[in-house]
Amino acid sequence: MEQAHTKTTEECLAYFGVNENTGLSLDQVKKNFDKFGPNELPAEEGKSLWELVAEQFEDLLVRILLLAAIISFVLAWFEEGEETVTAFVEPFVILLILIANAVVGVWQERNAEDAIEALKEYEPEMGKVYRSDRKSVQRIKARELVPGDIVEVAVGDKVPADIRLISIKSTTLRIDQSILTGESVSVIKHTEVVPDTRAVNQDKKNMLFSGTNVGAGKAVGVVIATGPNTEIGKIRDEMAATEQEKTPLQQKLDEFGEQLSKVISLICVAVWLINIGHFNDPIHGGSWIKGAIYYFKIAVALAVAAIPEGLPAVITTCLALGTRRMAKKNAIVRSLPSVETLGCTSVICSDKTGTLTTNQMSVCRMFVIDKVEGDVTSLNEFTITGSTYAPEGDVQKNDKNVKAGQYDGLVELATICALCNDSSLDFNESKGVFEKVGEATETALTTLVEKMNVFNTDVKSLSKVERANACNSVIKQLMKKEFTLEFSRDRKSMSVYCIPAKASRAAVGNKMFVKGAPEGVIDRCNYVRVGTTRVPLTSAIKDKILSVVKEWGTGRDTLRCLALATRDTPPKREDMVLDEATRFIEYETDLTFVGCVGMLDPPRKEVMGSIQLCREAGIRVIMITGDNKGTAIAICRRIGIFGEDDDVSGRAFTGREFDDLPPAEQREACKRASCFARVEPAHKSKIVEFLQSFDEITAMTGDGVNDAPALKKAEIGIAMGSGTAVAKTASEMVLADDNFSTIVAAVEEGRAIYNNMKQFIRYLISSNVGEVVCIFLTAALGLPEALIPVQLLWVNLVTDGLPATALGFNPPDLDIMDRPPRSPKEPLISGWLFFRYMAIGGYVGAATVGAAAWWFMYADDGPNVTFYQLSHFMQCTEDNPDFEGHECEIFESPVPMTMALSVLVTIEMCNALNSLSENQSLIRMPPWSNFWLLGSICLSMSLHFLILYVEPLPMIFKLTPLNVEQWFIVLKMSFPVILLDELLKFVARNYLEG
């Protein structure tokens, strides 16, 4: 049923053809069940494991590697002799890499789908329903409820479906609907019509929503929506419809992969074509097919050389290390790639309650009446420090600390706060914090009494558990609470009836203490308290009191004000009818006004500094809240989102005002605004969409079920540690301490991680460029193979992987939070950098080929062939006069390969040192600025020695141990790469950067 909140109860009952007392007939139940289905959220149609695995192989680079593995497997099948073992190592290793990558990918995808399942925990198990087959109420499974059912709910129940209230069977009905609307206090419901067809869920006071909790009272209503049609069901649909976007880094790596795969394909084809003339060379036994297969192998080697197989593992490791560092700062990261996205966050949309504020109501101002002379009324105004529930803070008058017990008015005010109150403080020993037990507003009064300590109780020697309610207990020993007149909407107040405790023997009679909305309470006051006397309330005094209340309620702080009053001579208990709430207002008359307190949910202390940090880092902060606009703007001013005197027109909107704008202006509003109040979940998603259309990278915080769709849609969803499981599973990050400042620390960490990733991605890619150049040169010049696929895999995975991982530990730049966020479109490798890699890669390739050629042509223990003989080695036969005096076997010696591989590895170690900083010289950033890197270089070299000197590894890798002279040549050929890169850095620093 649509718009049920705008219909009368009779219209709702008539719509479903149901009688309030008997409920639906079994025929109607069956018909509605067939029509609307069970009252549960449909299970998420997740992808099957097979589909998830298949998805991991959609990446082009992965497919090229897979193809390379299949080809080398087929070729290995036809090998004979001792080659066979080596031949099978390569396809086996490639497959292992692919499997490992797929496992990580599938695991992350699986995590993403848990969010929708977590909604299930808000589904109630049972419901209490009236149906015509039984006289009394019956308990049935909640999934069997249908629209039209008459349902009963009572305190402690979870609301089983969306319900339109028909009648309330208690004084009040309070519902905690914070999971759905984000309201920090429970809401009082009624049964009257809410005529506004565009009311937000917060304003539908005659509706109960599925999954919310009944805090107090008992009521009967008619089910108007079940399952997917409920408000919580709509949230599920929205989440299911939200596609996860790829992070900026993932998009870049995808683009890079596509370009790389095109380049690889071109080079492979080119190598093949260049050598078509050699297919018939004698070395292949004159068989054209064998020649084709030989060059096919080289093409496979090229593919393996060009793909940085170690990259996914190194990225995952770096992100995982980043998440550990963030966890120490209270930011728990749930999805690894989002660590890097945090670094380019340009807008943070933050919830107000609990994130920017403490979500601990606290009284910050109060007044009692000082004196009344004729028409002139003077007040004693006080401010109170401390912004949490901890009973620590001072009472100040004119910025000087005062003792509250010296003011008679404050003693009575404290008495009312302590007695007219059902809440208390509790010290949670495991968390080490003071927490509320009961309503936030009342707990603020309890805390106020502790701070005032009007009877000078000795609290210094008490433990924290005893301290929590020490001063309140003293007051409760003087007066005993007999009964409470519950709060009701019509009178907007509550009261308690108290009698003096026997022990106190005080000369006071019975009293009624009242607290409530100032306008309503003052209307029922006939007197005001001045010191210990009471003075008749004149219109001048009343105007003075109301003007201060209005100023507090609408001024800079927009405080929530409560008036406190006493009925000095209440009626006798036996004359009061306590089961008729409508008569309570008669007993709360002839009151004496005592004072007024103003409270707010205060901003966290550290938030102001964080917002300043965001401003310097070029990040915009937008506050989004379900609270009203006045309160929201006041908090924005207090924390520095708005200046004290800023004009906020066009910069702060309510959800309704935002909806009233045409789409073009809504777009503009999202560009300018810094505050959205009275917002529904759908607005949050809309705001994220508009921000994304300006290419902003948005972080969105939330804690309720209602926030889940927006959390899922934003690039970075941030849930609160104290929030609902749904919010946590829909988000990328969870704040363990619910603190806004933690987000800013996480953004800083994200920026540092991205800078380091850029360094090691570039490092790994320059290594691959070198390998490709090496293979291309040997093939183009017709030289013997310098590197084979097994060796390339070893270098890419192991020897390069270790320093690359260590580069993730580079210390962050000092000015990292003074720069604007990087654009997500900024390429990983710009034009100049591309040239640098080509230059370095070209040198790496030339040096490796050079090392192999050196052994053939110049080494003392080498064959000393000429360059012509080397480049035509394929035509070597015993009867070819060009090769007289040389055995053809020398061209298959493992020494030149070992030389080439050693040069490659050593150059890569030098390159790792070059990567310590993008443009800083090694003189400015010495190697010991990153000890992890030095350690990993030593480890990589040790592993290289391992495959040269420890049997049977040299056989598998087709290598042989080198002597001292050969190592000398290796070092001579490797070190110039440092000089070359220093030169390129010098050019970048002095001619390109400014």
From Swiss-Prot:
Binding site for Mg(2+): D351, T353, D703
Binding of Ca(2+) 2, residues: N768, E771, T799, D800, E908
EC number: 7.2.2.10
Residues exposed to the Cytoplasmic side: 1-48, 111-253, 314-757, 809-828, 918-930, 986-994
CC annotations in GO: endoplasmic reticulum; endoplasmic reticulum membrane; endoplasmic reticulum-Golgi intermediate compartment; H zone; I band; membrane; perinuclear region of cytoplasm; sarcoplasmic reticulum
Keywords: ATP-binding, Calcium, Calcium transport, Disulfide bond, Endoplasmic reticulum, Ion transport, Magnesium, Membrane, Metal-binding, Nucleotide-binding, Phosphoprotein, Sarcoplasmic reticulum, Translocase, Transmembrane, Transmembrane helix, Transport
Gene Ontology molecular function: any one: ATP binding
UniProt function note: Key regulator of striated muscle performance by acting as the major Ca(2+) ATPase responsible for the reuptake of cytosolic Ca(2+) into the sarcoplasmic reticulum. Catalyzes the hydrolysis of ATP coupled with the translocation of calcium from the cytosol to the sarcoplasmic reticulum lumen. Contributes to calcium sequestration involved in muscular excitation/contraction.
Domain comment in the entry: Ca(2+) and ATP binding cause major rearrangements of the cytoplasmic and transmembrane domains. According to the E1-E2 model, Ca(2+) binding to the cytosolic domain of the pump in the high-affinity E1 conformation is followed by the ATP-dependent phosphorylation of the active site Asp, giving rise to E1P. A conformational change of the phosphoenzyme gives rise to the low-affinity E2P state that exposes the Ca(2+) ions to the lumenal side and promotes Ca(2+) release. Dephosphorylation of the active site Asp mediates the subsequent return to the E1 conformation. PLN and SLN both have a single transmembrane helix; both occupy a similar binding site on ATP2A1 that is situated between the ATP2A1 transmembrane helices.
Protein name as annotated: Sarcoplasmic/endoplasmic reticulum calcium ATPase 1
Organism: Pelophylax lessonae
Gene expressing this chain: ATP2A1
